[in-house]
Amino acid sequence: MAKLKITQVRSKIGGNRKQHAALASLGLGRIGKSVIRDDRPEVRGQINVVAHLVTVEEVSS
């Protein structure tokens, strides 16, 4: 299964509750923090909610 490296590049200040919850469920909360998650539909949906706050790159397993 492919992996995604998700990095927060913009602040969550000014975002709505849905965006705050999506960042928290991804394990993000600070600018510059990165996490690696499986490439699953659930994770892709959370990324779509905060796409303007994060960068996503595919990494090899």
From Swiss-Prot:
Pfam families: Ribosomal_L30. Transmembrane segments: none annotated. Keywords: Ribonucleoprotein, Ribosomal protein. One of its GO terms (biological process) is translation. One of its GO terms (cellular component) is cytosolic large ribosomal subunit. Gene3D superfamilies: Ribosomal protein L30, ferredoxin-like fold domain. CDD domains: Ribosomal_L30. InterPro entries: Ribo_uL30_ferredoxin-like_sf (IPR036919), Ribosomal_uL30_bac-type (IPR005996), Ribosomal_uL30_ferredoxin-like (IPR016082). It comes from the Bacteria. One of its GO terms (molecular function) is structural constituent of ribosome. Belongs to the universal ribosomal protein uL30 family. Part of the 50S ribosomal subunit. This is Large ribosomal subunit protein uL30. It comes from Thermobifida fusca (strain YX).
